[in-house]
Regions:
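Conserved catalytic cysteine-centered active-site region
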Residues: 7-15
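Glycine-rich anion-binding loops and their surrounding alpha/beta cores
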Residues: 11, 33-40, 45-189
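Core alpha/beta catalytic barrel or barrel-like domain that forms the active/cofactor pocket
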Residues: 15-21, 83-86
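Active-site-proximal loop->helix
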Residues: 21-38
Length: 189
């Protein structure tokens, strides 16, 4: 989520499709909602926001109402499932370029190949070696690129790219309030 905000601030266009947290403390929808974003906004209004600010959020339950029927079961399970893969596969903006965090290494190369069949052009999937489904500063990050129809894999070490290596406990949050504070802190620094 944070990485996407930085991309938008740098002039990139971000059409984030997401949901409330089902397996962690805070999902993308939780963060946007805390900032006062209307999760049930109509698509035309979301398009206006994207054109004006280069970033928008599309609440999965608004665009795919059937997902409401599995929300309680997902929360009860408390772990990542195939439903976590549906977001990138069903992004209503039909984006051609995506950065996707995956919860299992087996999806690093599988997800880009599925999206390629749907017309995607440039896809990057990432999973950190400490188990996070996003870039981490506490471990190396395994990435897979789909670019111009070809797949590439690599490992990104935070120290090699000039970042301070942290411990996992330094970046873990324990409450939704902590998640919001951490998000705002990074944006302000």
């Amino acid at each position: 989520m944070l990485f996407r905000s930085v991309i938008a601030a740098g002039g990139g266009i971000v059409a984030k499709h997401g949901n409330r947290s089902s397996s962690g403390l805070s999902g993308s929808a939780d963060i946007f909602e805390k900032f006062g974003y209307d999760l049930n906004m109509e698509p035309a209004k979301i398009t206006d926001i994207l054109e004006k600010f280069n970033i928008c959020f599309m609440f999965a339950q608004k665009f795919h109402p059937a997902m409401k029927n599995v929300a309680t079961a997902r929360k009860t399970l408390g772990k990542r499932t195939a439903f976590n893969l549906l977001g990138p596969l069903t992004n209503p903006a039909n984006v051609k370029n995506q950065l996707i965090g995956v919860f299992s290494e087996e999806f690093l190369d599988r997800l880009p190949m599925i999206l390629k069949r749907k017309g995607a052009q440039n896809i990057m999937t990432v999973r950190s070696e400490d188990g996070m489904d996003e870039f981490s500063t506490s471990a190396k990050n395994r990435i897979c690129f789909l670019k111009e129809g070809k797949m590439f894999t690599n490992v990104v070490d935070p120290e090699i790219v000039g970042l301070h290596k942290s411990s996992l406990k330094d970046i873990q949050i324990s409450t939704k309030v902590d998640a919001l504070k951490s998000f705002v802190s990074v944006l302000n620094n």
